[in-house]
């Protein structure tokens, strides 16, 4: 588990850096061909209500999720983001699959450099090992901060 | 020390997840039978003033601390909490005891999903190894955010 | 790289603790004799504009940076600081030099214990190994939170 821990942390930190640096076209490369990416409110999760805040349930949808960001066809208020990923835990190992979780805090800053809390949540992931690489098969981002006062313009 | 570092981080992350998921009945299990748990303001600590914001100086008090939470007999404004534990350091090793510290940021979110800073502080811990397990013998939570505008309804 | 990762994290956490505990006289000891320490706005960095928010481009300037803090000759509103350093990554190794990055969140708390976001940024570092020690040869702190509503009284 020692190896997985450091590999997993690095995987999460690279993923986070990619988003913070706005390399959105690289984002789908963190997912397996068959994958799911969802943002859910903690309120719904705790009541076993299935409706997500947003959901991609195929790799094509993951690609589509960032297509407009990459092509700059989406008009929205630009913000800087910074991901603080901590409390990384391997919860279960099963052959080439890992169940893992981490807490994620995303701070947004506007173009005047004024910062505020944006996302407070937990990643609940199913990760697969593919050769030397880790890939996300299933990511559920459960957010405490579901009263988000901005549109979810960019991935978490 | 390498082993201790990862074990200690995992211990802290499990402890944090237990609180975030509101498994309060499990909280006393992180402490030794003879233990102390205190929340102190940084203001008092820096002036060597002993008064804590709250203190449990026996395991029974630790159990009592969460008894009302477990039994739902305490009425208070429900909040979600998320612990971000970082900067984990083993400061000293002495036989089966470790002195350790970590920084802790707790973000609270109300039932409408609006998030704010709740606790900003440092854990100053005396940890003992008991078989394969780590247990807290003494936890001092020194908080910078002692101007807490909520009651300390739940443990940190 | 495994060793470097834990050593580097510990180096960052010790550095952070030194600042949080206001041991400013120790701060220059984290730097090599020939060194650079800069705080830059993300706005400027992304446009390749060179002006920093503050810059020390010699060890003497680093010493000078904290001299007034150490001697208590500077009058400013005292604040507590707490560094949350996460997402630590070794980006490149080259002999005894490491390129590394980490995300840094600094929360400030005033003397009444009211906390707020202070610095949200990324360390971009050139670290050298000197015997058993790590030292900073070049630190660029790129801040998203460049609309800082306080003077940069203390180092980051």
Regions found by a protein language model. Give the residues of each.
Chain A
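Short, low-complexity N-terminal intrinsically disordered segments enriched in polar/charged residues
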Residues: 1-21, 26-33
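Short helix-to-loop capping/linker segments positioned immediately adjacent to catalytic or ligand/cofactor-binding
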Residues: 15-16, 71-78, 111-114
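Surface-exposed helix-capping loop/turn segments at secondary-structure junctions
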Residues: 18-26, 74-75, 79, 133
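A solvent-exposed, acidic/Ser-Thr-rich amphipathic alpha-helical stretch
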Residues: 33-103
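A beta-strand edge to alpha-helix "cap/lid" segment located at domain peripheries
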Residues: 84, 89-156
């Amino acid at each position: 588990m020692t190896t997985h821990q450091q590999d997993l942390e690095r995987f999460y930190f690279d993923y986070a850096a990619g988003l913070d640096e706005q390399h959105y076209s690289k984002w789908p490369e963190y997912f397996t061909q068959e994958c799911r990416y969802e943002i859910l409110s903690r309120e719904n999760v705790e009541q076993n209500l299935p409706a997500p805040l947003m959901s991609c349930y195929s790799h094509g949808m993951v690609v589509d999720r960032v297509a407009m960001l990459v092509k700059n066809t989406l008009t929205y208020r630009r913000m800087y983001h910074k991901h603080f990923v901590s409390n990384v835990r391997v919860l279960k190992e099963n052959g080439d699959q890992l169940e893992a979780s981490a807490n994620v805090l995303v701070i947004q800053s506007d173009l005047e450099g004024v910062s505020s809390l944006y996302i407070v949540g937990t990643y609940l992931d199913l990760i697969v090992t593919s050769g030397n690489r880790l890939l996300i098969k299933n990511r559920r981002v459960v957010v405490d901060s579901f009263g988000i006062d901005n549109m979810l313009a960019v991935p978490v």
